Amino acid sequence: MRQFEDYVLESFDHTTGWYQDNSYESLNRTADQLMQFRLPTGLKLSFSSLATPNFSTSYHLGAGGRFDGSICYLFSSVPLKNVVSSSESIPLTALLRSYRQVQDLPPFQPSHGAVPPAPTPTPGERLQEFVKQPWLVFGRMFLPESMLEAQVVKRASPNLRFQVKGVSQADLPNGGTILGSVQYTKPRYGVAGLLSTDGGLLGFRGLYNFGGDTTPTTSSPRAVGGDENGGANGCDERERIYGRFSAGGELYYGVLNKSAGASLGVRFATLPAHSGTPLTATFTLAPLMGNISSSFAVMARQSCSLATRFDFNVYSYESDWTIGMELWGKGRMAGLIDRRLEEEEAQIVPVDMGPAEKKRERSFQAKMEWRLDEDDETEPPLPNKREEEFSGVLKARMDQHSKVGLLWEGRLKSLIFSLGTSVNLSKPEQSFRSLGLAIQYSS
């Protein structure tokens, strides 16, 4: 289960228009979420609130052998008005779904030759424009360890932003560490530079997109085959594949410990306009360590997603595989007992089957305009929550060592719960390892 503060952090990117899929860091995000979901240990309680559209708080309390917890505060310079904060009404798919489909690229900006050049801004105007850009501050304190975590995000322009993360604790070397990054994104590519005080780490990441929607077109893809004559428009419109290839890599070097690392990766993911089955395939290579990894994730149905990963090391000849799945359900067993479904059943009114049709009451708009409704003026039907919203999800994973992880998540009234356990099938005498329950409430 994603924490409420992570959900708000992601909503900040959506509100400010930051494109998240142009980061090499998120290349394997879909497969990782399907096969590396966290299992709760012990009992964990979370209480969160979006007090204002700009400010949110979260409190966590855990009892897994010992009592611990954390306090989180988040402030955004832009109001997050589109965030559904109530745990009673928040869509479960937005909070619990692991399969994340790659979104369409942001619109391409017109070339410099198509628009007249704008006057060069003065340094004062540039500073004023920088101050107006969105920013976010996040802080979290862990108890009783007294560890402090902080994060600051500042947009410098629509395509450039700065991000600083820090952790402070007495047990860490030098009392803590700071990681700073500069991220620049365009519709076709995204790059990032990293600097960390932990070992003097310097890093660079980049991701380039090609194929699919990376080439702007003057006509809409719906025009393909839309003309019955099929002639001119079909010839002028290029063939489009409803998937996008992405290739990138990262390179980092530790100045103090004289260590280096590199990674290369390729991803193919279908786009939302794809009419077939959504899928994501990735391949990564770490040449210095000799690790090769490939993963494949598919949303077989709206209620079922599957993923698999295979890892191999060319130096030690060791291999590893993992499979994962999530299965959504609409019944009561999927989400325990959804009281809203019972309320809907209690509100069902018998339909009058008599020959006389009951006169429909005038709409509110017609009453305000002192007129009668038109014959074809009908109110849109209300969405059926039973059909459009899932009640819960069952997640499972297993590796080659017969270690199984099971997670059951759903909603009970205004509480979102997560019940998980891990089982080792290779050792029947010690098969049951742990059981945990996490409960989250937000308003």
Swiss-Prot record:
The UniProt record lists the keyword Mitochondrion: yes
A GO CC term assigned to this protein in UniProt: SAM complex
Record key words, sorted: Membrane, Mitochondrion, Mitochondrion outer membrane, Transmembrane, Transmembrane beta strand
GO biological process assignments: establishment of mitochondrion localization; mitochondrial genome maintenance; mitochondrial outer membrane translocase complex assembly; mitochondrion-endoplasmic reticulum membrane tethering; phospholipid transport; protein insertion into mitochondrial outer membrane
Chief place of localization: mitochondrion
Compartment annotation: Mitochondrion outer membrane
Topology class, membrane: Multi-pass membrane protein
Domain of life: Eukaryota
Pfam family, one: MDM10
Keyword Mitochondrion: yes
UniProt family annotation: Belongs to the MDM10 family.
Biological role: Component of the ERMES/MDM complex, which serves as a molecular tether to connect the endoplasmic reticulum and mitochondria. Components of this complex are involved in the control of mitochondrial shape and protein biogenesis and may function in phospholipid exchange. MDM10 is involved in the late assembly steps of the general translocase of the mitochondrial outer membrane (TOM complex). Functions in the TOM40-specific route of the assembly of outer membrane beta-barrel proteins, including the association of TOM40 with the receptor TOM22 and small TOM proteins.
Subunit structure as annotated in this protein's UniProt entry: Component of the ER-mitochondria encounter structure (ERMES) or MDM complex, composed of MMM1, MDM10, MDM12 and MDM34. Associates with the mitochondrial outer membrane sorting assembly machinery SAM(core) complex.
UniProt domain comment: Lacks alpha-helical transmembrane segments, suggesting that it resides in the membrane via beta-sheet conformations similar to those predicted for other outer membrane proteins and porin.
Name under which the protein is recorded: Mitochondrial distribution and morphology protein 10
